[in-house]
Regions:
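Bacterial N-terminal signal peptides that target proteins for export
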Residues: 2-13
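Bacterial N-terminal signal peptides
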Residues: 12-21
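Sec/Tat signal peptide C-region and signal peptidase I cleavage site
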Residues: 24-28
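Soluble non-transmembrane domains of integral membrane proteins
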Residues: 29-191
C-alpha cells in the first residue's frame, strides 16, 4: 500500500515536471524592467527566440500581427548563442521603464560579426515606432550607428513599455550579447574605447 502511494506520488511529480518543462521554453520573464537605479541591464531572462529556414521565416508584419503563433524559446539567464546556422532567427523582448527618469536608452549588441541585423521597436499595442539595420553586410550609411558594435536608440519614458524584435541572418555564429544602456552610460562606455 505504501509502495503504491509512493509510486503514484512519483508519477504525479514526474508529470508535473514534464508539463513544466514543456511550458517553460515558450516564454522568458514578461519584461526587462528599468528602475530608477538602472544604468545598464542585461535583459536575458526576458529574451526569447526562434529560428526557421529562410523560406519559412515570417515577414515582420506577419510576425507582429500574431507573435504567439511562432515557436518561441526562452534563452534563460544567458545570452543566446545559436552557433552557425543558415536559418533566419527572430528575437523578442519587452522592455518596461518602471520609474527611471532617463528617456533615451541604447540597445547594444556586443558582437560585431553578425551579417544582417534588423531591429524593430513597437509600442505595447503594436504600433511600429522604428526600424534600424546594422551588421557586417549592411552599408555604413544604412547602419543605425557609426560604431562597429551594433547599437540602436530607444526612446522609453518612465511608465512606458516597448516591444523589441530583432531579426538576425549571418554567415558567422549567431550570438546575441545584449545590453540596455542609459544614454549617459552608453556615451561614457563609447568614450572609454
Amino acid at each position: 500500500m505504501l509502495q503504491d502511494a509512493v509510486s503514484h506520488t512519483l508519477r504525479f511529480a514526474a508529470l508535473v515536471l514534464l508539463l513544466g518543462a514543456a511550458a517553460g521554453p515558450a516564454r522568458g520573464d514578461d519584461a526587462a524592467v528599468l528602475t530608477s537605479q538602472t544604468e545598464t541591464l542585461k535583459p536575458y531572462p526576458a529574451v526569447r527566440y526562434f529560428c526557421s529556414p529562410a523560406a519559412e521565416s515570417p515577414a515582420p508584419e506577419q510576425l507582429f500581427g500574431n507573435p504567439e503563433a511562432w515557436p518561441w524559446r526562452a534563452t534563460g539567464n544567458e545570452m543566446a548563442n545559436l552557433g552557425f546556422t543558415a536559418d533566419h532567427c527572430w528575437f523578442h523582448l519587452t522592455v518596461r521603464n518602471q520609474d527611471n527618469a532617463e528617456n533615451e536608452w541604447r540597445l547594444v549588441v556586443n558582437y560585431a560579426l553578425l551579417g544582417q541585423l534588423d531591429t524593430y521597436v513597437l509600442t505595447s499595442d503594436g504600433e511600429r515606432l522604428a526600424h534600424f539595420s546594422a551588421g557586417m553586410d549592411s552599408a555604413f550609411n544604412e547602419r543605425a550607428s557609426a560604431e562597429a558594435t551594433p547599437s540602436f536608440p530607444l526612446n522609453l519614458p518612465p511608465g512606458e513599455q516597448r516591444e523589441l524584435y530583432l531579426k538576425v541572418v549571418s554567415p558567422h555564429s549567431i550570438q546575441l550579447p545584449l545590453e540596455l544602456m542609459s544614454n549617459p552610460a552608453f556615451q561614457s562606455a563609447t568614450l572609454a574605447h
